Amino acid sequence: MGVPSELNHEDASAASAPLNRTDLFWSWQSGYKHLRMDVAPEGGVLKPDNSTTTTWNIHLGSTGCVGSAQTGETVNCSADNRPIIELDVSDIANQQIVIDYGKLVENSSLLNDQGGAPGCMSGPTDLDCPDIFDALGMGLGENSDPTPGQTVFSVETL
């Protein structure tokens, strides 16, 4: 899951499909979102300052990036944030890969944001991210220990 490092920092407006999707590009990190899931809970999301917003988002992407591919520099990111998902798919014609959103957010409150941008934007200090990253079997930030095993993806027989 995610965009390979060598393609992650191309110019989205000049890229070929599917990398031409600018809604999946993070201008502030000059790279693509590896996963984007946005929900609009009924009643909105309460922020710490008691204001509300309409969506709670999960945007998984590389962070801590330096360098500019547009100027020919090599881009290096301190946290690639690409989960490794291994599944046993033995009969692709009769099986499908399933993403369980409920498992992804089961320890998160979609009605209450803990600060910053609503939901998890992959930041190492974003309080809404640790449980999301745990569900994906990843560590959060550049020096974190990953949680063994992901709980979000599975294989089902058709």
Regions found by a protein language model. Give the residues of each.
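A short, solvent-exposed, low-complexity linear motif enriched for acidic/polar residues
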Residues: 1-158
